[in-house]
């Protein structure tokens, strides 16, 4: 077991989401994320062309009086071997009522499609339970975002759910054309 009761074999532990992005936590809410016809499963690989548009996100929870914040980050920007921009914020949605999806929330930072250039990047969705509706301000920039600092600033505590996928540059793109 890793601190917080997460088994060492948990995909979030194996994929180093626990440690690089957040501390160990207990899953308490269902979180489903999907692009087009494919659901995101921990560690799956999706191509940049498949994630150009925002995903559909379904949040569980007890009832619609409970609100959640969704954060999407890339802890491997600009490259896994030199993550000097860790974390890169791709999306931030707040005030999502339980049992609904992100379309019912407030988009604080609009979705930016990941476009990894070097290496395999982890794209992480983290769901936090809010104490109530709250005003959240967009950070001044997307790079060097800290999920831990953000959660502390807005008194969100540890995540209640998370899922991640891997993404790398598609072969055959960006080359010279004759």
UniProtKB/Swiss-Prot annotation:
SUPFAM superfamilies: PEBP-like. Expressed in leaves but not in shoot apex. Induction: Follows a circadian rhythm expression with a maximum transient peak four hours before dawn in long-day (LD) conditions, but barely expressed in short-day (SD) conditions. Targeted for mRNA cleavage by Pooideae-specific microRNAs miR5200a and miR5200b in leaves in short days, but not in long days. CDD domains: PEBP_euk. One of its GO terms (biological process) is regulation of photoperiodism, flowering. InterPro entries: PEBP, PEBP-like_sf, PEBP_euk, Phosphatidylethanolamine-bd_CS. Involved in the regulation of vernalization and of flowering time. Belongs to the phosphatidylethanolamine-binding protein family. This is Protein FLOWERING LOCUS T 1. It comes from Brachypodium distachyon.
């Amino acid at each position: 077991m890793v601190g917080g009761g997460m088994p060492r074999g948990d995909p979030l532990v194996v994929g180093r989401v626990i440690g690089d992005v957040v501390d160990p936590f207990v899953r308490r809410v269902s979180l489903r994320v999907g692009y087009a016809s494919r659901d995101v499963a921990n560690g799956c690989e999706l191509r940049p062309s498949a994630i150009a548009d925002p995903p559909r996100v379904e949040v569980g929870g007890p009832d619609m009086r409970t609100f959640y914040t969704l954060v999407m980050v890339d802890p491997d920007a600009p490259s896994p071997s030199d993550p000097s921009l860790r974390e890169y914020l791709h999306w931030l949605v707040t005030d999502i009522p339980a049992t609904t999806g992100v379309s019912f929330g407030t988009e604080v930072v609009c979705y930016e499609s990941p476009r990894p250039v070097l290496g395999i990047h982890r794209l992480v969705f983290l769901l936090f339970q809010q104490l109530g509706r709250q005003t959240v301000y967009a950070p001044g920039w997307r790079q060097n975002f800290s999920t831990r600092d953000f959660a502390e600033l807005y008194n969100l505590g540890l995540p209640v759910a998370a899922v991640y996928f891997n993404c790398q540059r598609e072969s055959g793109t960006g080359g010279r054309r004759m």
